[in-house]
């Protein structure tokens, strides 16, 4: 009856419960009991319910002193729970809490401040600073605002569920829950400053930063997880970022890996960047396991890549979590040095492959300064969309080199002698789209053919020849020797 009606209304809503072990109250004047007074009490298992987004408190054991200006609580309790239903689905449960919390009030608000607490949970300990401003009504001059900071050391990454608000956009919250199934927090800090408005509101901020070790980064279901030796995690209202100097994907060692999640109003973009200096075969093996590169599988699975020299590779994968397929954007850059590559399609192997290869989702494969050796002869390689001969081309390439007749016969496994010898310039065009096309062209200058006219020719004479292959069940090879002959041959082993 001594309190104002509004205070009584709030007190009733809070539903305080517990045991008052001892109480001492001193009043200066009985006719003005709230003017000057002092109180000392000891409470056990004190509990209050959540009220208008104000946290609920369960299981407080504390000694309290108070007067008309404010109060101080010395807390030493077991099995404590902090209930914040507008932020966390489950209460924050602590097996013990030790610390102090001060309070003061004015006509239209209560201020809990200078809270310094040491808490222990099942899997971690935390040092906590806590303050909250609680208005008594919507018309109060004081907005609802909480200031919470918690630091932890040596804890499993699973404790993030105790700190990361479920009010994050659902895809981002779900990603964070599944992205870090394994790992250890070496040290971390969590901050909340502001009220409890919709997530990302400009009047409030939530931030988390941690040093992690032994992390498994399951960044996308169905993709190979990355294992990060040491990493840093940062999370705020619109971004989740992780960095690692060293890691591993499949059997491939990674360096300078960065994963970023940007939460926008209409999209949630995941961006993965990494580098590697692995061997060529390790690079291709790892890339083959990425669903993001499924469009490139026909090319990668045709090739057997080897070599012992380090291959510098950078990869950038970007997509919208809300719409992965149409938004997927992949960039891969590979700097090859003295690699070997064998094509099952062409039944051909190249050595000393060096230069820069690129793959882009929109344009397919490209190259810069790529050279190799075929038949122990230098080959110039050009790869890029400008060479495409069909829509939706994945890879369009041109190979220019010199070949001896004996090399070609050996390549095709022809054991019987032919009336031709010499060396000629050859251009091979390869186009991989919904169908695969191979065109081999030469003017045969440098090759002599010891046959009667019109088939015979001298070394210096030009006699354009084109041999084409298409991935269809009939007519594997089509031969056009312009002005001399044409043929269709079926050689299944060629394809």
State what each model feature region is:
Residues 1-51, 64, 70, 74-122, ...:
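Extended amphipathic, helix-rich lipid-handling scaffolds
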Residues 20-22, 112-114, 125-127, 187, ...:
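Hydrophobic residues on conserved beta-strands that form the core of alpha/beta folds
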Residues 22, 57-61, 94-98, 125-129, ...:
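Transmembrane beta-barrel architecture of outer membranes
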Residues 52-54, 120-125, 221-223, 250-253, ...:
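Solvent-exposed loop/turn segments connecting transmembrane beta-strands
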Residues 57, 94-96, 110, 224-227, ...:
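Short solvent-exposed loop/turn micro-motifs enriched in small/polar/acidic residues
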Residues 60, 64, 112, 126-130, ...:
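Extended, hydrophobic alpha-helical segments in both membrane/secreted and soluble proteins
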Residues 87, 114-116, 129-130, 229, ...:
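Short beta-alpha junctions and helix-cap segments that line functional grooves
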Residues 133-135, 232-240, 250-268, 355-359, ...:
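C-terminal, active-site-flanking charged/polar segments
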